[in-house]
Amino acid sequence: MIAYTVKVGSDGYESWWLNGQLHRVDGPAVEYSNGGKAWYLNGKYHRVDGPAVECSDGSEFWYLNGKYHREDGPAIESSNGNKYWYLNGR
């Protein structure tokens, strides 16, 4: 079992830390009070099965190992409709 340090802000912001880095294996490492979420592993944005960043405005950002990456669609989907494709950060 992993022993995380969980920090909770007065505004409801929650973050999970391991060895001084944002890190969580079984869910988002950051949950914002506005509903946004961010997944981290070893201090880098990372999520295999969905966007690593989900913003409260509906924008989504897909990362693997800290780099924009998505094989089956745009790695960035902005709430204004803009879309950007990346593989391994390029």
Model-identified regions with their sequence ranges:
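Glycine/tyrosine- and acidic-biased, solvent-exposed loop/turn segments at the edges of beta-strands
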Residues: 1-90
